[in-house]
Amino acid sequence: MKNKDLNNVPSSMRKVSHMYKDWFLDYASYVILERAVPKIDDGLKPVQRRILHSMRKIHDKRYHKVANIIGHTMQYHPHGDQAIGDALVAMGQKDLLIDTQGNWGDIRTGDKAAAPRYIEARLTEFALEIVFNKNVTKYQPSYDGRNNEPVSLPVKFPLVLAQGAEGIAVGLSTKILPHNFNDLIKCSIAVLKDKPFTIYPDFQNGG
């Protein structure tokens, strides 16, 4: 609708049209950046980044109840315990960044994980080595301003390719297939040596 035609439209409808015009991009950007799509810098969605940051804060080399990790992560993530728990289980099932104990289910059989109060987790040595470096990490205030959280983590490995990613946002979606860990190591070495390489997706469930 052209601006000159707005004169014939009731003021309430004009306000709604302006709200849509002004706020839709803000809403879409929020969903894309804050929930659905991983950041290419570290290959993590916000909930995944907050889980790892929280696990690093409480890390003492011992296993922690998943319920405790979820509660600690809620200091940084405003979207509820269920979203945190689901994301934590999904990362744990990939057996890369999180060392698990108890019944975590199996993506190959469709079995679900036990309740958070019955299973435990801690960071793997691999995660401690390649994900964190406080000297080069930029921080921002958490959603309520009480804490600081990483803008992104200084990951030294192509996590987004190792874990894969899937998400639906406003006006777009992402689906990145997982890749084999050993293949990624070889390709990372090839990149450092400025040599050509070819890599194909891999599937944890054998599909």
Residue ranges and their predicted role:
Residues 1-207:
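Catalytic phosphate-handling regions of large nucleic-acid enzymes and associated NTPases
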